[in-house]
C-alpha cells in the first residue's frame, strides 16, 4: 500500500492541539471515534455527506453562533466524549449503549439520527464541544488556520483533490 503524503504533518498538528489542550492523543482511523478509557480519539479525512448533514443539523441548531467546519465539529465532539466520560457510571454507560444498539432497528434515517443525538453521551459531547469552541474562539481559529491548509495539501499531494 502506498504511503499517504502529508499525513504525518496532519497528525502532528492535531496531536499538538489535543495533547496541549486536553491531554488526549489522536490518530487516523476509519471514522471519528472516542476511546475514552485510553484518552484517545480517532479522526478521518473522509466523512460521508449524510453523516455530516445529520450531525451538523443537530450541532448547529444547538450552537448557531459556532461557525466551524464539519471536521472541527466532529473532532471536538470526540474530544467532548473523552472530557465528559466521567459523567456516567458504568451502569449508565451500559444503558446508553443498549439504547444506541436498539437504534439500528429504527428504519427512518432522520428519526434514528434524532434519537441518536438525544442519547446522553452524544448530547453532552456535542454540548461540551460547542461550549469549548465558543469560549476558546482564538484557539480554535489558530488550530483551524494550521490544520485546514495541511488537509488541503494532503488532498493535493495524494491526488484526492484536483485543482
Residue ranges, per PLM feature:
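Short Lys/Arg-rich cationic patches that frequently serve as NLS/NoLS or arginine-rich RNA/DNA-binding motifs
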Residues: 1-5
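Zn2+-dependent metallopeptidase catalytic core
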Residues: 6-21
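Active-site scaffold of zinc-dependent metalloenzymes
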Residues: 25-69, 79-86
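Long, well-structured alpha-helical subdomains associated
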Residues: 67-69, 108-163
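A conserved beta-strand element that flanks and buttresses the S-adenosyl-L-methionine
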Residues: 75
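Post-HEXXH active-site segment of zinc metalloproteases
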Residues: 85-122
Amino acid at each position: 500500500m502506498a504511503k499517504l503524503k502529508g499525513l504525518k504533518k496532519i497528525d502532528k498538528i492535531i496531536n499538538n492541539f489535543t495533547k496541549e489542550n486536553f491531554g488526549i492523543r489522536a490518530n487516523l482511523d476509519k471514522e471519528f471515534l472516542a476511546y475514552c478509557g485510553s484518552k484517545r480519539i480517532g479522526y478521518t479525512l473522509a466523512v460521508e455527506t449524510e453523516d455530516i448533514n445529520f450531525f451538523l443539523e443537530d450541532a448547529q441548531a444547538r450552537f448557531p453562533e459556532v461557525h466551524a467546519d464539519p471536521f472541527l465539529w466532529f473532532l471536538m465532539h470526540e474530544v467532548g466524549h473523552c472530557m465528559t466520560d466521567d459523567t456516567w457510571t458504568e451502569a449508565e454507560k451500559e444503558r446508553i449503549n443498549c439504547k444506541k444498539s436498539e437504534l439500528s432497528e429504527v428504519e427512518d434515517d432522520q428519526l434514528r439520527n434524532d434519537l441518536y443525538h438525544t442519547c446522553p453521551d452524544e448530547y453532552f459531547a456535542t454540548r461540551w464541544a460547542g461550549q469549548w469552541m465558543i469560549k476558546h474562539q482564538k484557539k480554535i481559529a489558530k488550530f483551524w488556520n494550521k490544520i485546514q491548509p495541511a488537509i488541503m495539501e494532503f488532498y493535493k499531494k495524494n491526488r484526492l483533490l484536483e485543482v
